[in-house]
Amino acid sequence: MKHFEANFDGLVGPTHNYAGLSFGNVASFSNAAQTSNPKAAAKQGLQKAKSLADLGMVQGVLAPQERPDLYTLRRIGFSGSDAEVLQKAAQQAPALLNACCSASSMWTANAATVSPSADTRDGKVHFTPANLVDKLHRSIEPVTTGNILQATFNNDRYFKHHQHLPEHASFGDEGAANHTRLCSEYGHAGVELFVYGQTATNPDAPKPTKYPARQTLEASQAVARLHQLEDESCVFMQQNPNVIDQGVFHNDVISVGNKNVLFYHEQAFLDTETKFDEIRRKMNSDMYFVKVTTEQVSIDDAVRSYLFNTQIITLPSGEMAIIAPTNCQENPAVFAYLNELVTLGTPIKQVRYYDVKQSMQNGGGPACLRLRVAMNEQEVAAVNQNTLMDDGLFTRLNTWVDRHYRDQLTVSDLADPQLIIESRTALDELTQILKLGSVYLFQR
C-alpha cells in the first residue's frame, strides 16, 4: 500500500488584517495597523497549495473560522443587534474587537497535532485541536477547528478526533507548530518529536523571560497519551528559551523535519546532543541532522526570512525539496545558505520559492499555513474528497474569493457591520463547495 504525507492548508478568511495581536511574533507586531489585502492573501495561499498539488503531493484545504466572532463578543457583555455589538465593541474595547476578527486560523500548523496510524496503538489517525490559550485571538478557535477537522476527516473507521486540552496555561498547546514526525518511510512507525517551551509544574525549570513560552511539556505529554503513542515513539525536547526571547515563538520558526531529516539552527534546542542520541536510538535508522550555525545564518535573519518556517516535502521522485517564502531569496545570507544546502549531500536537493507575503507580514510562512497528515491510500480515500486540491477546486475557490473578498482592509474596517454579512455569506457558500455541513455557529 502507498503512503503519503498530505498537507492541508488553511484558507485565508475574509477578515485577514494586520492588528498586531501576537506578542512575541516580531513580524505580527512590526506590521500592526498596515492595510491588508484579504483577496491577495487568499489567492497567495491557494497558489501555494495548488503548486504542491501540481508537484504530485496530496494537498487539501481547511476552512477558515467565522469572523467577526459575535458569539465571543456577546459572551463578554456586548449586546444588541449584530451591528450594535460590533459598534459597542469598537467604541469600548477595540482590542477585543480586533481579537474577535482575526483570520489567524489560516495558520493550520496551529490547528491541531496529528499522529498517523502507523504510530498509534489503535491504528487510527489521531487529531487533537490545539487550545492556543496563550493568545486571546487564537484561544477562541478550538471548538470550530474541531468541527472543521471532523467534517474533513469524516470517517470513524480511520480517524479519531479528541477534544482540545483543558483551557489553562499549564496545558498551553500550540499544535503541530511544536511537533515533527521523523520516520524512514511515511507508512512505517516513526518517532514523534514534541518540542516545548517550559515545564508548567516546575517553577525552577528553564523558561524564557521576555516572551511567553506557549507550549508546555505537560500539554505535549497529554497529547501523546491521547494519541495512544508508545514511549519508544516519543521524544520530548525543550526549545532554547533564549531563542524564544529573540522572537522564535514556535519551534517551526527554528527547525523543520521530514522523514529522516531534521533541519535546525544550532541555537534551537536545549540538551541537543543527548536528545538527538535518543532520536537515533528510537528511530533505529539513518538520520540527517542538518545544522545551520549562527555564523552561517543569525537568529535575526532566520526569523526575518523564515528560513525554518519552510516546508520540506518528499517529491514523487524521492528527492526532498524545501518550499520557501520569497523572503528567503531576498535575504543575502539565507539565499546563499540555501544555494549551498542543496550541494551538501543531504536528501534535500531542491529549493522552491513562493510568494506568501500577506501571510508573512502577519508572522506566518509556508510551514505555518499547513497541517501535515501522514496517511495510507485507504485513509486518503476516506477523507472528504471535496477538500482535496485539484484543478476544479482551485478554480472554484479562486472564483469564490473574487466574489466575496475585499482587496483592502484596515483595522478600522473591522467595525463595519457589512463585514459580518460578507463573511457569513462567503463561509456559507464555502461549506457547500467543500461539503462540510454546518460547521459554523451561525448555520445552526
From Swiss-Prot:
Any Gene Ontology biological process: arginine catabolic process to glutamate
Pfam family, one: AstB
InterPro entries: AstB_sf, SuccinylArg_d-Hdrlase_AstB
The reaction(s) this protein catalyses: N(2)-succinyl-L-arginine + 2 H2O + 2 H(+) = N(2)-succinyl-L-ornithine + 2 NH4(+) + CO2
Sequence positions that bind substrate: 19-28, 110, 137-138, 214, 252, 362
Pathway connected to this protein: Amino-acid degradation; L-arginine degradation via AST pathway; L-glutamate and succinate from L-arginine: step 2/5
Active site: 174, 250, 368 (nucleophile)
Database matches in HAMAP family: AstB
Family: Belongs to the succinylarginine dihydrolase family.
Function: Catalyzes the hydrolysis of N(2)-succinylarginine into N(2)-succinylornithine, ammonia and CO(2).
Protein name from the UniProt record: N-succinylarginine dihydrolase
Organism of this sequence: Shewanella frigidimarina (strain NCIMB 400)
